[in-house]
């Protein structure tokens, strides 16, 4: 019996892939740092073993899948090579796996995870669908027709894939530790476009995506009249959003979604366009759109007394804009409070003014110290450099969250890609202690 061993199983993509293989009746185990990470909950529910890193975890007969964050010098990878066991990097293994299905890659600087989650939810309402979402969620179906997966542009990892379809949500400059500029980002997406086998669904409102060249049809969606799929007559309500879809200027149907903000309409349009081209029944699409509950760390909302707490992964100015816009649509009468933790020194420095501009759209801003990722832990920049660019911004630590209590009827949005959740947890605990 083959055992699949994951080196770095708590990574968001790795965790999802492990879940898929387990659901397909394979034996799966993995290793990682002992620090608890949100992705391990789904692994534990499936009784997938999570071991501390140890070269003795590697044994003959295993299939070794290694996370991209771990170098060839990692003790388990070295042990595998000493035993002449091939080591499959995550993105290469995923590329091989998806070739067995009608595959749909969802990529873009922003909106990948939400769109992948929405597409998976809609498709599985009509056909058996396996999916891999970048929030650590994976689901495998043995007789799948479709394989829907999130494809990341960072370090051009998505060039390991040759999908049947690609949804491209947008092109924006991010990951300044790797990409030189927007032209470098575009070149990566252009190269990816040439690897797609059946068709590309791209946001036509995005100026960069308008320039994409491909060997397959490129179908554009968006708000502009030149798009193949266009959203019109948009009704933004506190219980979701309703809009009409026109296909090449001909009315197609009216859809309701559970999401808020223009970005949610665009995500849904991409899904509607793909389903149209795969002849998925429109009534099934409409129903599934109304039952989507979202993905982890993307506008996850919970009430707490008179306040509302939202947990969101937003870590780029464009994403912060979208999250604040969505909060204002759903809660038009409430004070919007942003609690933001910048992620990586390189990104914070590159987009310092843009971060200040986007955060200033909240009524009050609190800033946590910069979170240095595993890729870089040093920088001369400090959080005060961002604070002085935002009127009234205050600094906050996980021991001073009680200051948030004064926003009696506020919507508190905890945003970031680092460990912002510990600040949220500290505040929730603070409130619970005070209520006793």
From Swiss-Prot:
Reaction(s) catalysed (UniProt annotation): UDP-N-acetyl-alpha-D-muramate + L-alanine + ATP = UDP-N-acetyl-alpha-D-muramoyl-L-alanine + ADP + phosphate + H(+)
Lineage: superkingdom: Bacteria
Gene Ontology CC, one term: cytoplasm
UniProt keyword terms in alphabetical order: ATP-binding, Cell cycle, Cell division, Cell shape, Cell wall biogenesis/degradation, Cytoplasm, Ligase, Nucleotide-binding, Peptidoglycan synthesis
GO biological process: cell division; cell wall organization; peptidoglycan biosynthetic process; regulation of cell shape
Subcellular location: Cytoplasm
Molecular function per GO: ATP binding; UDP-N-acetylmuramate-L-alanine ligase activity
InterPro entries in UniProt: Mur-like_cat_sf, Mur_ligase_C, Mur_ligase_C_dom_sf, Mur_ligase_cen, Mur_ligase_N, MurCDEF_pg_biosynth, UDP-N-AcMur_Ala_ligase_MurC
Positions with a binding annotation for ATP: 108-114
Annotated EC: 6.3.2.8
Cytoplasm recorded as keyword: yes
Chief location: cytoplasm
Function recorded in the entry: Cell wall formation.
Record family assignment: Belongs to the MurCDEF family.
NCBIfam families: murC
Name used for this protein in its record: UDP-N-acetylmuramate--L-alanine ligase
Originating organism: Bacillus cereus (strain ATCC 14579 / DSM 31 / CCUG 7414 / JCM 2152 / NBRC 15305 / NCIMB 9373 / NCTC 2599 / NRRL B-3711)
Gene: murC
């Amino acid at each position: 019996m083959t055992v699949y061993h994951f080196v770095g199983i708590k990574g968001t993509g790795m965790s999802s892939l492990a879940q898929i293989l387990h659901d397909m009746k394979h034996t799966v185990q993995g290793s990682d740092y002992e620090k608890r990470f949100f992705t391990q909950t789904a692994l534990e529910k499936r009784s997938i073993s999570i071991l501390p890193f140890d070269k003795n975890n590697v044994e003959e007969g295993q299939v070794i899948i290694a996370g991209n964050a771990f170098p060839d010098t990692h003790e388990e990878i070295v042990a595998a090579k000493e035993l002449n066991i091939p080591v499959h990097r995550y993105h290469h293994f995923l590329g091989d796996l998806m070739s067995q299905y009608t595959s749909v890659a969802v990529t873009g600087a922003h909106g990948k995870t939400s769109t992948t989650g929405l597409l998976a939810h809609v498709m599985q309402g009509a056909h058996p669908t396996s999916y891999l979402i970048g929030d650590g969620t994976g689901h495998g179906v043995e007789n799948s027709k479709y394989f829907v997966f999130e494809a990341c542009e960072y370090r051009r990892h998505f060039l390991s894939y040759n999908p049947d379809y690609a949804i491209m949500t947008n092109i924006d400059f991010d990951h300044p530790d790797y990409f030189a500029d927007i032209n470098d980002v575009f070149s990566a997406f252009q190269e990816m476009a040439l690897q797609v086998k059946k068709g590309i669904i791209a946001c036509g409102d995005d100026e960069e995506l308008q320039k994409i060249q491909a060997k397959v049809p490129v179908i554009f969606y968006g708000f502009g009249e030149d798009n193949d799929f266009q959203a019109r007559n948009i009704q933004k309500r506190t219980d979701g959003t309703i809009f009409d879809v026109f296909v090449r200027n001909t009315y197609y149907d009216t859809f309701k979604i559970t999401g808020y903000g223009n970005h949610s309409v665009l995500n849904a349009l991409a899904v509607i366009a793909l389903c149209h081209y795969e002849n998925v029944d429109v009534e099934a699409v409409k129903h599934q759109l109304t039952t989507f509950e979202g993905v982890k760390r993307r506008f996850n909302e919970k009430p707490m007394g008179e306040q509302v707490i939202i947990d969101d992964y937003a870590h780029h100015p464009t994403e912060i804009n979208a999250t604040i816009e969505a909060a204002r649509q759903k809660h038009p009468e409430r004070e919007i409070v942003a609690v933001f933790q910048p992620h990586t020194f390189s990104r914070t420095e590159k987009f310092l003014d843009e971060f200040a501009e986007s955060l200033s759209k909240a009524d009050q801003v609190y800033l946590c110290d910069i979170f240095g990722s595993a890729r870089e832990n040093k920088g001369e920049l400090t959080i005060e450099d961002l604070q002085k660019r935002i009127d009234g911004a205050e600094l906050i630590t996980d021991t001073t969250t009680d200051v948030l209590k004064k926003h009696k009827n506020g919507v508190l949005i905890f945003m970031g890609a680092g460990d912002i959740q510990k600040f949220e947890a500290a505040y929730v605990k603070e409130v619970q202690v005070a209520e006793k």
